Amino acid sequence: MGSRFFLALFLVILMLGNEVQGNQEDDSGSLALLGTVQGSLLSYWTSAKEVAKDLYQKTYPISMDEKLRDMYSKSSAAMSTYAGIFTDQLLTLLRGE
């Protein structure tokens, strides 16, 4: 998300810089260069997004799913153990033994 902010800020500064310069001669070479730079930045951003998305989809379901299942089984086993101990203590207290 930070990269999007910096890219947007860069484009806003670029547009403000063009407004400050006023109506000077439009050099078709500079416009072509600007279009090329914008196109390459957009293609780089799109490819980086796709690579990150693919990497996330490859790594998340395998490792994170196993870790979450393991944490759930360990925590539910611990909770059932402590619930049993609490129940035994409560019954002993109520019976008065």
UniProtKB/Swiss-Prot annotation:
Q: As annotated in Swiss-Prot or TrEMBL, what is the tissue specificity of this protein?
A: Adult and fetal liver, intestine and peritoneal macrophages.
**Keyword set, alphabetical order:** Chylomicron, HDL, LDL, Lipid degradation, Lipid metabolism, Lipid transport, Secreted, Signal, Transport, VLDL
Where it sits in the cell: the answer is: Secreted
Residue ranges the record marks as coiled coil: none
- GO BP term, example: negative regulation of lipid metabolic process
Q: Give the residue ranges for region: Lipoprotein lipase cofactor.
A: 75-97
Is Secreted among the key words of this record? yes
What are the boundaries of the region Lipid binding?
63-71
Q: Name one GO molecular function term.
A: phospholipase binding
- Superkingdom of source: Eukaryota
Can you quote a single GO CC term? Answer: cytosol
Spans through the membrane: none
Which region is the signal sequence? 1-22
> Its family?
Belongs to the apolipoprotein C2 family.
Q: What is this protein called?
A: Apolipoprotein C-II
What species does this protein belong to? Mus musculus
